[in-house]
Amino acid sequence: MRIVSGMRPTGKLHLGHYFGVIRNWVKLQEEHECFFFIADWHALTTAYKNTKELRQNIREVMIDWLALGLDPQKSVLFIQSLVKEHAELFLLFGMITPKSWLELNPTYKDLKYNLLRLTDLEKEFKEKLKERISEIVNLIPFNITKEEKFREHLLENLTQTMIEALFEGEIEPEILKRLNVSKRDFYETDTFGFLGYPVLQAADILIYKGEGVPVGEDQLPHIELSREIARRFNRLYGKIFPEPKALLTETPKIPGTDGRKMSKSYGNAVFFSDEKEEVEKKVMKMFTDPQKIRKNDPGRPEICPVFSWHKLFTKDEELVKKIEEDCRAGRLGCVECKRILLKHLEEFLEPIRERRRELEKRINEIEEVFYENSRKAREIAQKTMEEVRKAMNLP
């Protein structure tokens, strides 16, 4: 089976990337023909104004991929933007893809919903505030506000001042904070690139006639759209593309140090580039069961991020079982539990860290490997595009 998948270059990789994606890719490359690409064009859908670090981020992904076990001898590891045919097929797919299909994309729907919700909240807030201020203005003695224009002017100025002070100063920032986005980014993300990125994903997969795409459940709508586009193209111009299947694999969830989803933007991630001292700081500050304040307090391992990590890094199943039992019984304190975890986490991280150091010294050589793989990928992509142009009667 031909497997195709990609990853946006947002910087150095962390434990969440490994358990969510890379570990599965490493297994797949042993059994299938795999194409894994650094999706630098996709990075621009939400970060088109901040390209200063893009090239360095691409290098970091290259290093981490190889350090974590992806092998350019077993997989085609390449950079999306070096294969220009992705963009050509994206353009042609865009001609046949109804806009309504894209507007059903859950990610886009969420953006539009949040935009509308924020606008509605602002409108509702302003109207209620104006009503309240109007009541206050009406309480002012008539001889001070006998001029209607003065009354209106006073009402307008007070309303605007209160909106700036309350909504724009306190309420709106809190909403945007919960959405994890700045106000400018929030509005400027509503672009053609953001609307159309699922079509680019379809082109990424189908340019290699990908048959399988390893994804999580949240990506299923995108794979279904790729299948719809393939079907529509085949119906219009003749059978060129397979209908790719989603390869749903069970991946362990590794929470961040604060219990939320592990993310660079949340500041709760452990990176493969972190030195031992930095990892220790992060682990010792990890959130635990809030009800377990003292060592002899009974704990609830099922809600504790530290125990979730034990299940991944502490390989001795009997020890994991004992940690769970001792935590529940109040025989194991959180500090000691973290120190046990740290020992096993370091056994996992140190070999990867060492490989990373060696790879960093050979970055020019590694870049050339990715460039050469990109040339291999492009040869295949060019053959696909020859078939596409012929089917569409393009020169």
From Swiss-Prot:
InterPro entries: aa-tRNA-synth_I_CS, aa-tRNA-synth_Ic, Rossmann-like_a/b/a_fold, Trp-tRNA-ligase, Trp-tRNA-ligase_bac-type, Trp-tRNA_synthetase. It is found in: Cytoplasm. Its EC number is 6.1.1.2. PROSITE patterns: AA_TRNA_LIGASE_I. It comes from the Bacteria. L-tryptophan binds at residue 204. Keywords: Aminoacyl-tRNA synthetase, ATP-binding, Cytoplasm, Ligase, Nucleotide-binding, Protein biosynthesis. Belongs to the class-I aminoacyl-tRNA synthetase family. This is Tryptophan--tRNA ligase. It comes from Aquifex aeolicus (strain VF5). The gene is trpS.
